[in-house]
């Protein structure tokens, strides 16, 4: 956990939910920025279920997968033909390690229930923490953006939800969402962004608060300033909206 060094007393808490790359240096840096804005920031490592990451999700293996992804077209990790071409010429052991890590990452994306359970545990931990004043929000990115929305469907203790370019919850679940929600989306991020209008309509019909912004021309992961996808102007605007939203709903 991270908190402002000079702050006194209990603070609102924000759970920072990591991308598919895990709780890496970028996510820890984001947590530091949130703490600097006056919050208790907590980054659960969802890949370390039970306290230890499996070998295929170890940081060095994830870094190798990132480097491989950077050699592919956008979305290439999910494209079998693009992966096949990218893996050509690699040693067999290296190919196997990259594919093993990719399968592990995508398994979590496709089956998020365990991660949501772990996030409920993170909420409970914060509610019992002396540095938390009981006001809890989430800010999630990519995989974590989708998880933030799912957590809001199931946990009434979450008071504010910010989802960066994560798939919204199913429209049928809009009525179960307990907190106001801010969605940050990328124009060049189909099919995720294509699902936003139906979700927005469902939230409005259910009387729920859902503010959202789609950044035209921005790719998935445009906020990650360690990746080629980073876009400065979209990131500046999205971050300003995020801090305003957290201040409004968490104090």
Task: Identify the meaning behind each predicted range.
Residues 1-251:
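N-terminal cap/leader regions of alpha/beta-hydrolase-fold enzymes
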């Amino acid at each position: 956990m991270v908190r402002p060094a000079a702050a006194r007393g209990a603070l609102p808490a924000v759970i920072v939910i990591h991308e598919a790359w895990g709780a890496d240096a970028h996510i820890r840096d984001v947590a530091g920025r949130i703490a600097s804005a006056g919050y208790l920031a907590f980054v659960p490592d969802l890949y370390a279920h039970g306290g230890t990451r499996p070998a295929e999700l170890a940081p060095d293996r994830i870094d190798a997968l990132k480097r491989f992804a950077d050699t592919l077209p956008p979305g290439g990790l999910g494209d079998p033909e693009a992966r096949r071409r990218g893996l050509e010429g690699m040693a067999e052991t290296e190919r196997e390690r990259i594919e093993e890590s990719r399968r592990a990452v995508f398994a979590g994306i496709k089956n998020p229930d365990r991660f949501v359970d772990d996030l409920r545990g993170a909420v409970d931990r914060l509610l019992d923490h002396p540095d938390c004043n009981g006001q809890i929000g989430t800010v999630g990115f990519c995989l974590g953006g989708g998880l933030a929305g799912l957590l809001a469907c199931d946990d009434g203790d979450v008071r504010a939800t910010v989802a960066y370019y994560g798939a919204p919850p199913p429209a049928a679940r809009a009525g179960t969402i307990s907190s106001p929600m801010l969605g940050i989306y990328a124009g060049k991020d189909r099919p995720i962004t294509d699902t936003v209008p139906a979700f927005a309509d469902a939230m409005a019909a259910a009387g729920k608060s859902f503010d959202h912004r789609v950044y035209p021309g921005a790719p998935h992961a445009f906020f990650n300033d360690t990746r080629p996808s980073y876009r400065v102007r979209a990131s500046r605007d999205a971050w300003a909206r995020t801090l305003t939203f957290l201040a409004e709903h968490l104090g």
